[in-house]
């Protein structure tokens, strides 16, 4: 993060010609287990990772917000918070910031303008929530600058609202919530219905290894929508609000009444919720052997019942599994059809995992992976 801090300070100084008063950060995240459970009112178990979006900022006496984007060649955006805040077709990055500020105002928070420079190292397009980190860091920045009486949960909800309503991209609450509320060396069990969060301690030195398959993700939106519709259909047949409300016993008793495809989709969600709740308990107790089993079962369920993995991702999981055995867990993470795997790896096996993947993955698939070795880190807050 040191480089990011230097970059945002330097950009602030050079473009705005004075020094910032505050440095604020918000992290990206990875979901350890609980996939496609969020829109079924279920449970997820993400952790914040030490790839962040960082802001240098200072208050202004007027109502102007000026933003410098370091990652877009110090491109700037400027808007007046007392005027209508509009969507910028030709400057997509700025809409996340405009949306967050607009939603804060709509929620009744009062503040004046700000000068902001922003940069991040959360890999974009890898499903590690670079957009949520940006939304949360902007909310956090206004909280810090103006001592706003806003909870971390509301900063998260405000960011989600900005993405859904202003940017126009549907997302659940997980990404913003873990970015806003994460704890070092902890994952977070999130109940996607009540939004209740529980910090779950992780083995102190466990590495969180994220490997991007770099498989281009085709069909994601249409397949995602189909899965969602199938889950909603299953919930209707069971007469419940969401699949969260169906036990595996109830499912087994009625599975024969469901269309075979719908039954497979429902079985994944119902068993994944059970796995996620159990994973929170076994992770906290340090039982990595059981965690390894739960993550393996999650991956198999995504592959066979939810059918969202691809051969390249399955290959990556197999390569890592062969190295770590029962010492850690590995599974696909994210929406599917490409993307990343996540592995909980004891530190002494990290180099071995990297070596095996570098030796075997490209040879088997023709694709070159990207590897990120992370730790579970704190959520958004003031750095300086």
Swiss-Prot record:
Write out the GO cellular component annotations.
cytosol
**Positions annotated to bind Mg(2+):** 131, 163
Reaction(s) catalysed by this chain, per the record, are:
alpha-D-galactose + ATP = alpha-D-galactose 1-phosphate + ADP + H(+)
Q: So where does substrate get bound?
A: 35-38, 224
Keywords associated with the record:
ATP-binding, Carbohydrate metabolism, Cytoplasm, Galactose metabolism, Kinase, Magnesium, Metal-binding, Nucleotide-binding, Transferase
A Pfam entry, by short name:
GHMP_kinases_C
The record, for PROSITE patterns, names: GALACTOKINASE, GHMP_KINASES_ATP
* EC number(s) given by UniProt: 2.7.1.6
Q: Where is this gene product found?
A: Cytoplasm
Q: Does the keyword Magnesium apply?
A: yes
Q: In which pathway does it act?
A: Carbohydrate metabolism; galactose metabolism
The UniProt record gives the binding positions of ATP as: 69, 125-131
Site feature (Transition state stabilizer) residues: 29
Primary location recorded for the protein, binned into one broad class: cytoplasm
As for family, the record states:
Belongs to the GHMP kinase family. GalK subfamily.
* Its job: Catalyzes the transfer of the gamma-phosphate of ATP to D-galactose to form alpha-D-galactose-1-phosphate (Gal-1-P).
- Which PANTHER family does this chain map to? GALACTOKINASE-RELATED, MEVALONATE KINASE/GALACTOKINASE
Protein's name according to its UniProt entry: Galactokinase
């Amino acid at each position: 993060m040191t480089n990011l801090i230097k970059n945002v300070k330097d950009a602030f100084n050079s473009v705005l010609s004075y020094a910032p008063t505050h440095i604020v950060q918000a992290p990206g995240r990875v979901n350890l287990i609980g996939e496609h459970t969020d829109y079924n009112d279920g449970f997820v178990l993400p952790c914040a990772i030490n790839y962040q979006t960082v802001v240098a900022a200072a208050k202004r006496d007027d109502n102007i917000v000026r933003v410098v984007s370091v990652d877009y060649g110090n491109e700037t955006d400027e808007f007046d918070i007392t005027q209508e805040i509009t969507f910028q077709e030709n400057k997509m990055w700025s809409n996340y910031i405009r949306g967050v500020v607009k939603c804060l105002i709509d929620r009744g928070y009062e503040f004046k303008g700000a000068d902001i420079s922003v940069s991040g190292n959360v890999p974009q397009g890898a499903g590690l929530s670079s957009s949520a980190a940006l939304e949360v860091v902007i909310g956090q920045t206004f909280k810090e600058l103006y001592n706003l009486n806003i909870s971390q949960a509301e900063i998260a909800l405000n960011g989600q609202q900005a993405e859904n309503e202003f940017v126009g991209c549907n997302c659940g609450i997980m990404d913003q919530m873990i970015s806003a509320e994460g704890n070092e060396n902890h994952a977070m069990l999130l109940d996607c219905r009540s939004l209740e969060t529980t910090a779950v301690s992780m083995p102190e030195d466990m590495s969180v290894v994220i490997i991007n398959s770099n498989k281009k993700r085709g069909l994601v939106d249409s397949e995602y929508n189909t899965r969602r519709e199938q889950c909603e259909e299953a919930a209707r047949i069971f007469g419940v609000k969401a699949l969260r409300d169906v036990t595996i016993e109830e499912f087994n008793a009625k599975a024969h009444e469901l269309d075979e495809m719908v039954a497979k989709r429902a079985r994944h969600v119902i068993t994944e919720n059970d796995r996620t709740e159990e994973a929170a308990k076994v992770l906290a107790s340090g039982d990595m052997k059981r965690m390894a089993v739960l993550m393996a079962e999650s991956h198999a369920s995504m592959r066979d019942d939810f059918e969202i993995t691809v051969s390249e991702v399955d290959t990556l999981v197999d390569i890592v599994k062969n190295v770590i055995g029962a010492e850690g867990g590995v599974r696909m993470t994210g929406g599917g059809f490409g993307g990343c795997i996540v592995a909980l790896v004891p530190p002494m096996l990290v180099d071995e995992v990297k070596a095996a993947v570098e030796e075997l993955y490209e040879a088997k698939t023709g694709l070159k992976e990207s590897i990120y070795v992370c730790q579970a880190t704190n959520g958004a807050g003031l750095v300086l």
